[in-house]
Amino acid sequence: MWKLKIGEGNGEDPYLFSSNNFVGRQTWEFDPKAGTPEERAAVEDARRNYLDNRPRVKGCSDLLWRMQFLKEAKFEQVIPPVKIDDGEGITYKNATDALRRAVSFYSALQSSDGHWPAEITGTLFFLPPLVFCFYITGHLEKIFDAEHRKEMLRHIYCHQNEDGGWGLHIEGKSVMFCTVLNYICLRMLGEGPNGGRNNACKRARQWILDHGGVTYIPSWGKIWLSILGIYDWSGTNPMPPEIWLLPSFFPIHLGKTLCYTRMVYMPMSYLYGKRFVGPLTPLIMLLRKELHLQPYEEINWNKARRLCAKEDMIYPHPLVQDLLWDTLHNFVEPILTNWPLKKLVREKALRVAMEHIHYEDENSHYITIGCVEKVLCMLACWIENPNGDHFKKHLARIPDFMWVAEDGLKMQSFGSQLWDTVFAIQALLACDLSDETDDVLRKGHSFIKKSQVRENPSGDFKSMYRHISKGAWTLSDRDHGWQVSDCTAEALKCCMLLSMMPAEVVGQKIDPEQLYDSVNLLLSLQGEKGGLTAWEPVRAQEWLELLNPTDFFTCVMAEREYVECTSAVIQALVLFKQLYPDHRTKEIIKSIEKGVQFIESKQTPDGSWHGNWGICFIYATWFALSGLAAAGKTYKSCLAVRKGVDFLLAIQEEDGGWGESHLSCPEQRYIPLEGNRSNLVQTAWAMMGLIHAGQAERDPTPLHRAAKLIITSQLENGDFPQQEILGVFMNTCMLHYATYRNIFPLWALAEYRKAAFATHQDL
């Protein structure tokens, strides 16, 4: 059986190192001797149930580790389920019992170091490049044994669409990019051209050929296929590493771009500059024949360079971008790749690109900023030196990215340990059930304190285009190292809220100097418009988006200010100002005022706000209303609050809940779930937004209806059912946050119980 390990390093591995003794690290191991026959049967039942329900629910329930942890905690739900008949109102006891059931269940899932494990997956182009990399380096069977490979195959099969393709994410329609990547992955994992479950390979290949063949794969796919030798580098748009030699004031310097874009094109520029091609094995030669519509030698690569399947083309290239690529391809590259500039310039540019790769690797303990970047940087290190320490350090961190659930083994973005935990702690604090949550809060507090980043990136970090990180919290753990404004704000809130409780109950409060460091970071990320960026200050103008080369992402070229980040920071700074009124008071007051103005300016005509990290308008409207309320804005005093409330009330469904489709994100307009279904997490977000806007005092009826839906949807053991995908990045790609279904319904019930039963009177 598979078992989840928490906080484990490897004392015998000299290539694995940590800044805080691996607190928050979560890794999976397969133990062939583990588990009773009943436990193994339960795992198989979970796998069968997932497949049976997948036409309705694409995201897994993340059951394998939950079953393990519940057994280890000897969990037994002793509070009876809450029954509320049609036409019956909610009592204070109903709300309390449902809340206690949710708390007892979720508390049993807390890990030994205080965080809540969970997968953050759902994107279907994360895993294949890892398989490609290890196929090239010869490590595929060394790193992944038969059980790993079996579970990888399971995951790929589980998420194949009926038409034979794979979507950008688990709920997406088939696209060329992910269909090609997953087809090649199946072949590298041992499936024949017509093999796989339910003729998976044959169906996928037919989809690819019916849509024009692999020359229609978007730019990132062209790069990976060129690396593999299934495509030719001359059919890709140039990514010259010489861009690292440009002066930093140059308007299109990579140092000015969004950090994720910079970290992707950093190793890509190295691979492009080297024109690296992996071993042309018999399988690669077969794939050339299987995936192209014409003989490989006859393909017009310059023409193929501009091709992209319509299913993948979210961001069509403007004319200025095509002119840029044509100029680089036809004039600049021929000069840079021939003597004398190849020796004088190209080789220097490759060295500089590699210096940046090593710098980022070391400062993230070889986790890197994310899984897309991880694989590219790891491959670059292997190309530089197959037996070098850099590559071995990358190998040591591969387990940090792998996750196993009932739908198989997948690659995570990198982890959401801190993010999930700070929301969970705030939800538990809102419950006001101290006798039942004290131990959980103490452990969570310890994890948060240990996870704070205590130093800036090493050396002259500004010359490496990095920002300060001291005082920050990351999305995952301290070793990751990358500051995030909303993660920092939510963790800062937790530390301050817990500091107001007895130390003998929740542990010693964090040193004020560490809070000051956090505030310093947050203030540094406020932009000219008053909003907060996510990772770094804005360095580039938004017109740079004209050069977005990705085809299927939007808003990827420049850092920008976000409503959710701004709201989280406002809430944290308001509380900080109350507890530390003498620290940078004027700056904090001004920051809050500017943040409020930014949120108000971003409201859409229908009263909603567009979300960047959750789906979508409901998510951002919850954040916006919470931030405005924290700053003292009320329904009476603020038009934006009234419009936000009106938006939420207008889209409430007949069953009392709310439900929004992931299509809202790319379409940039509110789209309800098909059939006007409700989603419990989105219902919780809407409830909390309304509660913060004072809905309970005006007319609590919408809240009662929503709470009834959540309570009556609770499962026998206190869990909540898994429903639609809820996270998003870059507007087009969705993420599955598996623990959201526990945190937010619990949190909403806690807030509802306080707001609707202020005097403990039943309805």
From Swiss-Prot:
GO molecular function: beta-amyrin synthase activity; lupeol synthase activity
InterPro entries: SQ_cyclase_C (IPR032696), SQ_cyclase_N (IPR032697), Squalene_cyclase (IPR018333), Terpene_synthase_CS (IPR002365), Terpenoid_cyclase/PrenylTrfase (IPR008930)
Record-linked Gene3D superfamilies: 1.50.10.20
GO biological process, one term: triterpenoid biosynthetic process
PFTB repeats: 149-190, 592-632, 641-682
Organism, as annotated: Arabidopsis thaliana (Mouse-ear cress)
NCBIfam families, A to Z: squalene_cyclas
Keywords: Isomerase, Repeat
Active site (UniProt): 486
Protein name in UniProt: Amyrin synthase LUP2
Signal peptide from the UniProt entry: none
Record field: catalytic activity: (S)-2,3-epoxysqualene = beta-amyrin; (S)-2,3-epoxysqualene = alpha-amyrin; (S)-2,3-epoxysqualene = lupeol
Biological function: Multifunctional enzyme that converts oxidosqualene to nine different triterpenes, mainly lupeol, beta-amyrin and alpha-amyrin in a 15:50:30 ratio.
Assigned GO CC terms: lipid droplet
Family: Belongs to the terpene cyclase/mutase family.
Its EC number(s): 5.4.99.39, 5.4.99.40, 5.4.99.41
Coiled-coil annotated spans: none
Taxonomy of the source species: Eukaryota, Viridiplantae, Streptophyta, Embryophyta, Tracheophyta
